[in-house]
Amino acid sequence: MTATTQKDSSIVLRFLAAPMDITYGGTVHGGKLLEWIDKAGYACAAGWSAHYCVTVYVGDVRFTRPVAIGELVEVEARLVNTGRTSMHILVTVSSADPKTGEYTEATRCVTVFVAVDGDGRPVAVPTWTPPTPEAAELQASALRSAQVRADIEASMKDQVYTSAGTGLERTLRFLAAPSDVNWGGKVHGGTVMRWIDEAAYVCAAGWNRGSAIAVYAGGVRFYRPLLIGSVVEVRARLVHTGRTSMHISVHVRSGDPKTVERQLTTHCMMIFVGLDEQRAAPVPQWVPVSDEDVALDAHARHLIDLRTQTDLLDRELPRAAR
């Protein structure tokens, strides 16, 4: 395997937020930012591995503020660790008024990509060695975060969702269109995350009976590719409320429209807050009724505790040389 130069371990995408990027609320937020994150992460992973790559995990996405239409956007993806076939990539989205060029962060998260060959089988990637003490600290944090991620995945996988649950549930259903295709002929991981955000918003706004905005997305696990032309079902269920927050579990399933069989492709936990004049506002409190409700409410609280055990996203990050 040929060596990959250190400069290939990061990439910055730069563009203007266009009117077509607008989401609910009149700004660019949630699902569109997730699409940008996936594209930058893919570019970084493909550049490092020299292979086609697939998204397998996106975690701890913290939406700190929306991006305004017309702002200059920078999406920086940097490699922070490699496994045998996987690449852990830290992605930061920042934006600025073009007249000032003063960037502020809008969101940050960790993504995991796996390099695959022409038959879709995982292939080995070059080992990344931290070039600086700061990079070594990021790698150490990424390794600690990997265990937390495994705990989150295990907890999410153990939960049961049946008709016994009473939390508000909303489902979006549609066909995966040719315009959703990625470089490998499947549906973009970022597109799937946008669908997740949209379904969660419908659920949150319906429960709150008012405005809501995404503040967190986590545990986004991609189990299998989603094919163009498939029937897609995105089901969002309320599983916990805080004073201003709504925790929503989202499952994406897909299948051949000629059959009724649907397979799980993606699972995620989203957190929305209620809004009143663009400020966080109290939301109606959900009270678990069934045993399943109680278990899912406890699960959401457990995930809150797990998220406090990682420090990778709390570190100060220098902006890359532009």
Language-model segments: residues:
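Hydrophobic, helix-prone linear segments
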Residues: M1-E76, Y103, W286-P288, I304-L306
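Catalytic cores of nucleotide-enabled group-transfer and carboxylate-activating enzymes in metabolic
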Residues: K39, A177, H188, E198, ...
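A cross-kingdom feature marking solvent-exposed beta-strand/loop segments within repeated
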Residues: T55-E74, S94-K99, T107, I213-R224, ...
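Active-site helix/loop of acyl-thioester processing domains in fatty-acid/polyketide metabolism
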Residues: G31-H51, G190-A212
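HotDog/MaoC-like acyl-thioester-processing domains
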Residues: T2-L13, V67-I69, V80-A150, I228, ...
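Catalytic strand-loop segment that frames the active site of acyl-thioester-processing enzymes
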Residues: M1-H29, A140-W195, C203, N208, ...
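Short coil/loop residues immediately preceding or within conserved phosphate-binding loops
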Residues: V12, V58, T171, A212, ...
